[in-house]
Amino acid sequence: MSEPTPRRPAYARLLDRAVRILAVRDHSEQELRRKLSAPVMGKNGPEEIDATPDDYERVISWCHEHHYLDDNRFVIRFIASRSRKGYGPARIRQELNQKGIARESTEKAMRECDIDWSEMAREQAVRKYGEPLPSTFSEKVKVQRFLLYRGYLMDDIQEIWRNFAD
């Protein structure tokens, strides 16, 4: 009989897992920590990695040093992705907050991104309700509620009707 092969150290398994996770898409540091600490599905069901908190810190710092993990890059790409899907600034900020991104980083990236939120709100309203946009009060309320849900600010929503009246 052959002896079972020894398992790799926890640090090496964590590092391998982190690189595989980050190869798929960018993650925030908090997301990566959460995914690394979750059990891994093995051949015999979920397996815990017996890693110490120091192992996790070493993996996170290695990912930062080798530019696999960069919260600023993540924020910029996340804003671009969510805005392309039609979400507004309030919703994007809230989602970034849930992902553990500091408010300062979010605000800096929002200022740097070149997005006309009122035009985006108008595009979403036209896509959902058609051209011309509704003009009765009850229909305007529906459009407003939809855009607020999507994360647009009231100023951007009101801008739609100011421009529409011109």
Curated annotation (Swiss-Prot):
GO terms for biological process: regulation of DNA repair. It is found in: Cytoplasm. Keywords: Cytoplasm. It comes from the Bacteria. Gene3D superfamilies: Winged helix-like DNA-binding domain superfamily/Winged helix DNA-binding domain (1.10.10.10). It holds the Pfam family RecX_HTH2. Coiled coil: none annotated. GO terms for cellular component: cytoplasm. Belongs to the RecX family. PANTHER family: REGULATORY PROTEIN RECX FAMILY PROTEIN. Modulates RecA activity. HAMAP family: RecX. This is Regulatory protein RecX. It comes from Salmonella arizonae (strain ATCC BAA-731 / CDC346-86 / RSK2980).
